[in-house]
Amino acid sequence: MWDPAVYLAFADHRGRPFYDLVSRIGAKRARRVVDLGCGPGNLTRYLARRWPEAIIEAWDSSPQMVAAARERGIDATTGDLRTWKPKPDTDVVISSAALHWVPEHADLMVQWATVLPHGSWIAVQVPGNFETPSHAVVRALARREPYAKLVRDIPFRVGAVVGSPASYAGLLMDAGCKVDAWDPTYLHQLTGKNPVLEWITGTALVPVRERFDDVSWEQFRQELIPLLDDAYPPRSDGTTMFPFRRLFIVAEVGGARRSADVS
C-alpha cells in the first residue's frame, strides 16, 4: 500500500525531475492537461498554474494517493494507467516516475502519439537506476530466508526495466513526433537517519512491505541498514550522497512532419 506521507518525506528531491520535465513542454496554452501517476497531487497543482485555462485531469493506481490528491483539491481518478484513453481536447500528457511500473509503457506512449491531436505534447520521466545498490541489495536480501518464501511472487524489476533515451525517441519519431530525450543523474544530498532506506520505503519497497507482517518488515529493514550504509556511506557532515539516474522523453505529436514542412 502506498503511503503519501512516507512518499512526501523527500518531496523536494522527488519534485525536481517533475519541474525539469514540465519546463521542456512547449505548449503555451492547453485545453486539457493530464497527469498520469499523479501521486498525492502536490506537483499536479503546479500544472494548473502553468496552464490556468486548462482542465486538469489526474490518474493514479493507488487509492491512497488519489485520496491525498483529492484533499489538495485535485480531481483525481483511481485507475490502471494502461486503460487510460485521451479525450479529444487533450493537449498535454505528463507522467513523472510512474510508467516504469507498466511493462508495456513504451507501446502505450506510441498509442497515445497516434491518437492525440497534432501539436499536443507527451512528457514522460522514468527512473533508470534499477541496477544500482538501492535496488540490488533489496533483491539480494529478499532471496534469503525467511524472506524468500514471502516475496517469491514479486516480479523484482531487474535488467531492461526501462529503455534507453534513443529507443524511446526512435519509437516516437517513427510515430511522427519531434522528440527531446535525455538521461541525467541527480546527486541527491540526503539528510536524516537512514535516508536511503526511508527513500526506497516510499517507492521500491512498497510491494515488499505488502508481503510482510510488522515483525518481519522491521527485521527486513534492520538488515537492510548496514547494506545500504556500505553502498551509500554517510558523510561526517551528516549528509548521504544518493546518485539517481532518470530518463526524460518529451515529444511533440506531429512535430516531425511540421519540421519537415518548414525545412
UniProtKB/Swiss-Prot annotation:
Q: What EC number(s) is this enzyme filed under?
A: 2.1.1.144
Q: Where in the cell is it found?
A: Cytoplasm
Q: Does the keyword Transmembrane apply?
A: no
| InterPro entries, per the entry | Methyltransf_25, SAM-dependent_MTases_sf, Trans-aconitate_MeTrfase, Trans_acon_MeTrfase_C
Q: Which domain of life is it from?
A: Bacteria
Name any one GO molecular function. Answer: trans-aconitate 2-methyltransferase activity
* Reaction(s) the record says it catalyses: trans-aconitate + S-adenosyl-L-methionine = (E)-3-(methoxycarbonyl)pent-2-enedioate + S-adenosyl-L-homocysteine
Q: Which UniProt keywords apply?
A: Cytoplasm, Methyltransferase, S-adenosyl-L-methionine, Transferase
Question: According to its record, what are the GO cellular component terms?
Answer: cytoplasm
Q: Which GO terms describe its biological process?
A: methylation
The record, for NCBIfam families, names: PRK14103.1
The protein's role, per its UniProt record: Catalyzes the S-adenosylmethionine monomethyl esterification of trans-aconitate.
Q: Which family does it belong to?
A: Belongs to the methyltransferase superfamily. Tam family.
User: What protein name applies here?
Assistant: Trans-aconitate 2-methyltransferase
Lineage of origin: Bacteria, Bacillati, Actinomycetota, Actinomycetes, Mycobacteriales
The encoding gene is tam
